[in-house]
């Protein structure tokens, strides 16, 4: 199976909260994750993350910076992606697209998917014990390997 290319962003507001989107479908259905999605043909990574954030949340992005790149594999739905993580500042009022939900949350909140915890830690927004996080990821059907170090 071909590895898809995606871009996601840790959008932070003036209060240090991070913008999350409830996933409607796919391997992460029901989970609260960072906004983002697939990169379209001919589109840059930055343009893709800006477009996806605007579509999913209504927000624009400022101060966008690349943080990390991961190979992500999910075994149940055979999802494979190369995901580029950005960090930026959200501009505008957050609103969900039809059938979805968005919320501002503390980056160190409880109950987050292990993949989100890894991303927030790499973006410098959350402290995590690497061994504990690796064990948490092992309990999911998702593997994440950072490939930019």
Region locations from a protein language model:
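Flexible, glycine-rich phosphate/dinucleotide-binding loops
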Residues: 18, 27, 73, 92-94, ...
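Short connector loops at helix/strand junctions that flank enzyme active sites
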Residues: 2-4, 34, 65, 79-83
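A short coil-to-beta-strand element that immediately follows conserved catalytic motifs
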Residues: 59-68
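Short loop segments at secondary-structure junctions
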Residues: 13-16, 24, 89-93, 107-108
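Conserved N-terminal beta-strand and adjoining loop/helix that marks the start
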Residues: 1-18, 69, 87
